[in-house]
A protein has these predicted regions:
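Short, exposed beta-strand/loop patches in secreted or surface proteins that constitute
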Residues: 4, 40, 84-86, 129, ...
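Tryptophan-centered short beta-strand motifs
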Residues: 44, 55-78, 95-100, 105-107, ...
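Surface-exposed interaction regions enriched in Ser/Thr/Asp/Glu
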Residues: 65-73, 92-103, 107, 438-442, ...
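Beta-propeller and closely related beta-pinwheel folds
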Residues: 104-134, 139-290, 294-332
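Beta-sheet repeat architectures centered on beta-propellers
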Residues: 247-442, 519-650
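Conserved, function-critical positions that sit in or immediately flank catalytic
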Residues: 383, 440-519
Length: 650
C-alpha cells in the first residue's frame, strides 16, 4: 500500500475503480480499465460503469464507453430459454425439414442489477411467447416482459444505457392484484395486448403513440374465469376464449375493449349450456368463414359454432357437430381449410368452402357439390356381364389408408360427357385392395361422329364397332339424300381400353366413315357421411325490436312443416312421436318422368311440405341425408292450429 498526494489537480489526478464526477476521467489511461461513476453518494440508481478503450487496443490516448458492472451475470441461459423451430431450405425432392435449436439472446452490455436489472422471467416458468408491436413478449408469473423493438433476430431484454430511459428500452411490467394473477396467454387487439390469467383479464396499452417503459400500463379490464389450456382467438370484432370453471365449458366473447372502461362480455354458449365438455383442449377458428371449432384430444367429435355478423350486429348463429372416423390429436385452420391429425397420424383436410378440386356436377348453369369423405378418383374398371359387376383392382395405395370409416364406400360419376352423370353405387371391398360395383362402370363408347357421309346409299347401312379391347357396342346409321348423316348409339358397350373402329356395310352405298369416342374420365370414390338436423321444439314466436319471445303456455297443433331448400338431392325426414312409432319418409328432389335420363336428379331450390299433424309437445322432427347429393336447408316454417287456452295473466 502507498499514498499519493496531489498538490495541483490541474497537473495530475489520481483514481482507483470509482469516482463521483465523470469530468474527472483522464484522457489517457490503461486499455481495458473499468471505473464506476457514482453520481450520488447515497443512491445506487444513477451509478454506471465505463471502460477505457485505447487507440489500436493499447494504453494511452483513447475513449471511455459505458459497460456492465464487472462480475455480474451478463447473459441469459439459452438452454432454459425458449427454443426455436426453424424451417430449412428445400432442395430437390427432399421433404420439408424443421430444425429445433437453442436461440441466441443478446447479453447485458451496460449497467448493474439496479440500473439494468435481470428480466423478471429469469427463475420463473415462461407461460407464453408471442409478438406485439415488433417486440418479442414473454409472459412469466404476473409479469409481461417485452424485448427491445426490432430485435427479433437476436432478442434483447436489456437497456442500452444506464444513464437514460429510452423509448426503445424493454418493458417489464406487473399485473399484481388482490387475486392470483399469473398470466398464461395474450392476444393483440386494436387497443393493446389483452392478457389472460385464470380469473381476470388485463390490457397492456399506452396513452401515448409510442409505448415505452414510462408510458406502458397494465390494468385489469374484466374479472372472468379463463381456461389456461386453450389460447384465446380473434373473431374479428370480438375476442373469444373458454371458461371451464364449472361442469361444462362456456364459450365467452369480449367486445368493446378500451383503455378506460369495462368491456362487454357475453356467454355465447348460454343457449347450449351442456354442449361443450369441461376438458376441451383444442380450439381454432376461421374468421373468413365465420366459424369456430372446439375439440378434445382423443375424441372423434368436433363441436362448431357458425355466426353471421353485419356491422356490429350478430344476425344469425348456430351450433353443430362433426363426427370423424378417428379421434383427434390436433386441429387447425389455414385460409379456407380445416385440418386435423387423427390418432393414426393421418392428416385430413376439410374445405370450409368449395374448392376447385372438389367433385361437382354442372347442370343448367348450376354447380352441385358432391359430398364424399376421403374422396379420390378411380378409373379402368373391368365389367363382367355374367355377374353384372365391375371390378377395380390395385387400389391398395389408398383404400388401406382410410381406417375405421363411418360410412359406406361409393362411386359417383360426375363426367358430363356420359349418359350416367350423377349415378352412384355402393362398393364392396375385397382383399383390401380391390373392390366391385354393381352394374357397368367400365369405359364405354360415348359418341360416334360421321367424318364422311359417302354416297349411293338407298337404305341405312349396318354399323360395326370393333377393336379397342371392348365389346357389345352397337349403333344405327341414318341416311339422307344417299349419304350417312348421323349415327345413333344403341348400346355403349363395355371394357374399352382404346378407341374402337367404326365401319359401314351394305345399304347400296360406299365411302361412309366415322370415328368413335370412349369415356376416358375418372370416377369419384369416397365414403358417405351423415348430414342431420334436429329441429327445436315448435312454439309461436313474437318479435319485438331485437328480441324474440316464445309462447309456451298456449296449445299448438302442427299440421305441416315447410322446408325451404337450396341445392337439394335425396333426403329423408323422421317424426319421433310420443306413444307412436317413429315415421321416416325418403324424398327425391325430382320425380320420375320430370328430368332427362342423362341429367343428375338435383334441383337448385325446392320447398317441400312435410305432414306432421301432432301437438308440438309430442313430436320431434329430424332431417337427414346420407347421399352424395347436396342437401342445403335455408329455412323452415310451419302451419298449424294455435289456441291461447283463454289464459290471462294477473
Amino acid at each position: 500500500d502507498f499514498n499519493v498526494e496531489i498538490v495541483d489537480q490541474d497537473l495530475m489526478r489520481v483514481m482507483q475503480t470509482e469516482i463521483n464526477d465523470v469530468t474527472k476521467l483522464p484522457v489517457q489511461c490503461k486499455h481495458g480499465a473499468i471505473v464506476k461513476i457514482s453520481n450520488t453518494r447515497m443512491s445506487d440508481e444513477d451509478d454506471y460503469y465505463v471502460q477505457f478503450n485505447g487507440e489500436n487496443g493499447k494504453s494511452g490516448p483513447g475513449q471511455w464507453t459505458e459497460v456492465a458492472e464487472p462480475g455480474i451475470v451478463k447473459s441469459l441461459d439459452a438452454t432454459t430459454m425458449p427454443h426455436v423451430l426453424q424451417r430449412q431450405s428445400i432442395s430437390g425432392t427432399n421433404p420439408v425439414i424443421f430444425l429445433a435449436k437453442k436461440y441466441e439472446w443478446e447479453d447485458r452490455k451496460v449497467g448493474d442489477d439496479v440500473t439494468n436489472p435481470i428480466p423478471s422471467f429469469v427463475g420463473e416458468k415462461i407461460n407464453r411467447v408471442l409478438f406485439f408491436r415488433n417486440r418479442l413478449v414473454l409472459l412469466a408469473g404476473e409479469n409481461v416482459v417485452t424485448s427491445r423493438p426490432g430485435s427479433i433476430a437476436k432478442p434483447n431484454f436489456w437497456s442500452d444505457s444506464a444513464l437514460t430511459v429510452s423509448a426503445v428500452d424493454p418493458i417489464d411490467i406487473s399485473c399484481a392484484s388482490t387475486y392470483p394473477s399469473a398470466l398464461f396467454d395474450a392476444i393483440e387487439i386494436n387497443t393493446g395486448l389483452l392478457c389472460f390469467s385464470t380469473n381476470a383479464q388485463f390490457l397492456l396499452s399506452s396513452d401515448d403513440t409510442i409505448m415505452n417503459p414510462d408510458t406502458a400500463k397494465l390494468r385489469a379490464v374484466s374479472w372472468f374465469n379463463y381456461n389456461k389450456v386453450i389460447p384465446p382467438i380473434s373473431l374479428g370484432q370480438t375476442t373469444g376464449y373458454i371458461d371451464n370453471s364449472n361442469k361444462y365449458s362456456r364459450f365467452m366473447e369480449m367486445a368493446n375493449i378500451v383503455r378506460e372502461g369495462e368491456p362487454a362480455v357475453v356467454n355465447t354458449s348460454k343457449v347450449v349450456p351442456t354442449l361443450l365438455p369441461k376438458d376441451i383442449d383444442l380450439f381454432t377458428n376461421s374468421k373468413e368463414n365465420n366459424i369456430v371449432l372446439f375439440g378434445k384430444t382423443d375424441s372423434d367429435t368436433v363441436i362448431g359454432f357458425r355466426y353471421l355478423n353485419q356491422a356490429d350486429k350478430r344476425l344469425q348463429a348456430a351450433w353443430f357437430k362433426w363426427k370423424f372416423n378417428n379421434p383427434l390429436k390436433y386441429h387447425f385452420c389455414i385460409e379456407d381449410s380445416y385440418y386435423l391429425i387423427d390418432t393414426d397420424n393421418f392428416l385430413q383436410k376439410v374445405n370450409l368452402i368449395q374448392a376447385d378440386a372438389d367433385p361437382s356436377i354442372d347442370q343448367d348453369n348450376t354447380n352441385y357439390l358432391i359430398h364424399l369423405d376421403n374422396y379420390t378418383t378411380v378409373s379402368g374398371g373391368t365389367f363382367a356381364s355374367a355377374t353384372n359387376k365391375t371390378t377395380f383392382t390395385n387400389q391398395s395405395d389408398w383404400i388401406d389408408q382410410v381406417t375405421s370409416p363411418n360410412g359406406k364406400l361409393v362411386v359417383v360419376d360426375t363426367d358430363p360427357s356420359t349418359t350416367r352423370e350423377g349415378r352412384y353405387a355402393e362398393c364392396t371391398v375385397i382383399n383390401n385392395d380391390d373392390f366391385t360395383i354393381p352394374g357397368d362402370w367400365s369405359r364405354e363408347v360415348t359418341s360416334i361422329t360421321v367424318t364422311n357421309g359417302g354416297s349411293g346409299y338407298t337404305s341405312a347401312p349396318t354399323v360395326t364397332i370393333s377393336g379397342g379391347g371392348g365389346s357389345a357396342a352397337t349403333a344405327t346409321a341414318t341416311i339422307e339424300s344417299g349419304a350417312v348423316t348421323a349415327v345413333t348409339i344403341n348400346n355403349n358397350g363395355y371394357n374399352f381400353t382404346s378407341v374402337p373402329t367404326v365401319a359401314f356395310s351394305g345399304g347400296g352405298g360406299s365411302s361412309a366413315a366415322a370415328t368413335a369416342a370412349i369415356h376416358t374420365g375418372e370416377f369419384n370414390i369416397g365414403y358417405l357421411y351423415d348430414y342431420q338436423v334436429d329441429f327445436p321444439r315448435f312454439y309461436l314466436q313474437k318479435t319485438s325490436d331485437d328480441s324474440v319471445s316464445s309462447d309456451i303456455n298456449s296449445k299448438l297443433t302442427v299440421h305441416r312443416m315447410k322446408l325451404n331448400f337450396g341445392k337439394i338431392g335425396l333426403y329423408e325426414t323422421t317424426l319421433t312421436r310420443v306413444g307412436k312409432a317413429a315415421y321416416t319418409e325418403i324424398y327425391e328432389s325430382t320425380d320420375l318422368d320430370e328430368y332427362d335420363a342423362s341429367d343428375a336428379p338435383y334441383l337448385d331450390e325446392k320447398i317441400k311440405d312435410i305432414p306432421v299433424y301432432e301437438r308440438n309437445l309430442n313430436v320431434d322432427v329430424t332431417l337427414k341425408s346420407s347421399h352424395p347429393a347436396p342437401a342445403t336447408l335455408r329455412s323452415m316454417s310451419w302451419e298449424g292450429d294455435w289456441s291461447p287456452m283463454h289464459y290471462r295473466r294477473v
